[in-house]
Amino acid sequence: MKDVIVVIGPWLIGQAIAATVDASSREAVHGLLDTATGLGQVTGLIHAAGVSPSQASPSTILNVDLYGTALVLEEFGNVIASGGSGVVIASQSGHRLPPLTAEQNKALATTPADDLLNLPFLQPDQVTDPLHAYQIAKRGNSLRVMAEAVRWGRRGARINTISPGIVITPLAKDELSGPRGEGYRRMIDSSPVGRAGTPDEVGSVGALLMGPDGGFLTGSDILMDGGVTAAYWYGDVPEIQ
């Protein structure tokens, strides 16, 4: 899965360098890292590459959304500058996954990236549904970031996740027009806020986490879904099958 990732140098105000990168390839991610460090210190990372249940198979979702995220965090965590910060875009979907065991949580959080997809509970006979794969991947993202916050902290840097609900983006439009679209619309209508989110709203939370006002936040997962998860567990929203 290839995603356009933009690297902005500290002196390139209003300019950017774009690179097409396979987020699930260590060689490609390391190439992006070389490009970034060639511009100077890496002071920030925003990782939003991913595929949704309506777009890909379980194996592709685990490769891009789970392994790819671990890979990016591992590589950029080796060079992030003191005072730097990062944000990974996870998903409300990770909050709908039933509880994992303590051992599974630790494995998702700390297994070296290249060994991650060898975990027994991630094998094809265990994860057969794209939505299940997506939920595991996004739960894994927040757990991974919590563990990485310790390592990043040793460099004087911070890392957090945002778990958005349904935000009007091309990916969300694919989901709303896909086989689970009716269920997602029910979730929106039945949520406390009663609407989908906007990219600007997610961006505002991202700005807080990346900037000095978020200086006491690290290893945290910000769930911003208009109350969909609250309604899912404690309201009248039917479970999506």
Task: List PLM regions with ranges.
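Catalytic loop of short-chain dehydrogenase/reductase
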Residues: G50-P58, S82-R155, I166-T169
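A conserved structural motif in NAD(P)-dependent oxidoreductases
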Residues: S191-V202, D213
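Canonical Rossmann dinucleotide-binding motif of NAD(H)/NADP(H)-dependent dehydrogenases/reductases
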Residues: M1-Q15
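Rossmann-fold cofactor-recognition segment
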Residues: Q15-V29
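Conserved NAD(P)H cofactor-binding loop of Rossmann-fold oxidoreductase domains
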Residues: I46-P53, G227
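Short, flexible catalytic-loop segment of classical short-chain dehydrogenase/reductase
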Residues: P164-D174, A230
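Short, small/polar-rich loop/turn modules that mediate ligand/substrate recognition or access, typified
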Residues: R158, L217-G219
